[in-house]
Design a protein with these regions (language model features):
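A structural motif corresponding to the C-terminal lobe/cap of the Radical SAM core domain
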Residues: 1-99
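Radical SAM enzyme core and accessory elements
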Residues: 73-185
Length: 185
């Protein structure tokens, strides 16, 4: 809700931060606290805000109520997927390789009424995998690998191509010896 700041710039800034491999991306709504310069200049700057705590910006000349709602939902998406180590690498790649990914994934989560639901790590992994399967099949294997690396069940859909039953080790093992390095811990 900053003055002169548009919704498309928020999406651009998220892509820029993802490009820098930011560890986390936090989007929060602007609050106009009593006694601050921004609050004193709110009318001049075209900022409408809640008169009740936490005094959140509701609208500006540049960003509508519905666009601020989209920004809030984008924050939820980032918290659930980008800011979660298990899904961060895949989410970052999708953000960087397709300018429309955030818009598409947000629309997908919103249409499924999931954007405001609390979701377990497993549920988020299932959603991301299914979304990739439907919309980005070239990332399906990467989603499955992220699922397995996160320690999720091999009996669930993302691990569907992993063989776990009746697997017999080879008659002869190819043993590879190497040197232990403390940095491998």
């Amino acid at each position: 809700g900053l003055p002169l700041y548009h919704l498309h710039e928020i999406f651009e800034d998220v892509r820029t931060l993802a490009g820098y491999a930011a560890g986390e991306i936090q989007l929060e709504s602007l609050k106009l606290l009593p006694g601050t310069e921004m609050r004193r200049r709110a009318e001049e700057l075209g900022i409408k805000y809640s008169p009740l705590p936490p005094y959140e910006v509701l609208q500006t000349h540049e960003i509508s109520v519905s666009e601020l709602q989209t920004a809030r939902q984008l924050s939820r998406l980032l918290d659930g997927f980008y800011n979660t180590p298990a899904w961060q690498t895949l989410t970052r790649e999708l953000i960087l390789n397709d300018e429309q990914f955030l818009h598409r994934f947000l629309a997908y989560l919103t249409k499924a009424n999931l954007i405001d639901q609390p979701m377990s790590l497993e549920k988020r992994g299932l959603i991301l995998y299914e979304f990739c399967k439907q919309n980005y099949p070239e990332y399906q294997i990467q989603a499955a690998i992220a699922w397995i690396e996160a320690g999720m069940s091999l009996k669930k859909l993302p691990a569907e191509k992993v063989w776990t039953k009746r697997q017999i080790p080879p008659a002869t093992w190819n043993i590879i010896y190497g040197e232990y390095k403390e940095s491998l811990r």
